Amino acid sequence: MVSCMTTYNFDKITNRKGTNCLKYDFAVERGKPADVLPLWVADMDFPVSEEITKSLHAAVEHGIYGYSQPKDAYYNAVMNWMERNHNWKTEREWIVKTPGVVFALGAAVKAFTDPGDAILIQNPVYYPFTNIIRDNDRRVVDNTLIYEKTAGQSGDNGYRIDFEDFERKLEQEHIKLFILCNPHNPVGRVWTVEELQQLGEICLRHHVIVVSDEIHNDFVYSGYEHTVFATVDPRFAEFTVTCTAPSKTFNLAGLQISNIFIPNEKLRKAFQTEIDKTGYDEPNALGIVACEAAYRAGEDWLDQLRAYLLQNLNFLREYLQEKIPQIHLVEPEGTYLVWLDCSQLGITGKELDQFIVDKAGLWLDGGSMFGPSGAAFQRVNIACPKATLELALNKLKAAVDNLE
């Protein structure tokens, strides 16, 4: 592992406007005011690590961007990262490359189910899960997470799995595929080994394939530990597709490269067949370079980033408790996305979404996007300089203070 002594300044504000940035440059195109402050989509307002930048500079200066494929150094970096950070010893042949996790979800849906089949998800959940299922003519079956509002203390999230309903739905709907979000976006749960074991045993009994979206696996707060679902029991690895990417961890979403781990050869071949049908073959040339550099030498940057995100989380918690007590923080165990319970404002989900934009001047992700149970919530991205977060909270406070 390469050690970097660079101290990163995450307080520095980088102007992202005018860079074709989805987060900042497309407000009007998406029906928002031009001056809205965005804390929605899950990328970060921080420049990448020095090692990634240097590696990309070298690749760009070479001047030729032809068809590319990863070599041993790439695979070794990916596998070493998983073993070092997630206690998972993987094999090169398990890895299937895709341009993104959502792309991989679509391939899995087509590989392992047929039109009309039911696929189970756990709302409120990352909204592309629902879209991918419906867009491929499958049916969404929802095992809604149970939410019990807590006192707002660190370490008390309030969300849990309804295991009885989970198994009942698998039986009644003849579920073939379950899409797990681990860590969970947007509610911030980092599922325990015991919870994952129970899910796995149920899926094993009912012969259900699990696609585990673990893209947020490197963001877990102190006191919690991410467990790769496929490592809980060797039997589970045989029916699991594990989706990972450097995009969330190292802010590389625009370079479009993901690593999908499929130990079972039969499942892997079926998945690869669906990838082949799309015509996708060679990954983004610069994505290969950035991913290798990130996993090989990005740990120091990531450690500093995690510390900064924790400071932002603590600041947000204290701000809400002291100045906007009507809005409740659902304590995240992981991810840099926080889930705000706005039910005490006494307005409908649709009214809440309009209030956030029109009165607070903010662009957040409205909770209804994540399923009906999310209507009273808003998702906020705290991976930004503290000054940006403070400005957003000040705008939110002013709007709540004036709410009639």
Describe each model-derived feature in a short phrase.
Residues 63-72, 78, 161, 292, ...:
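Short secondary-structure boundary segments
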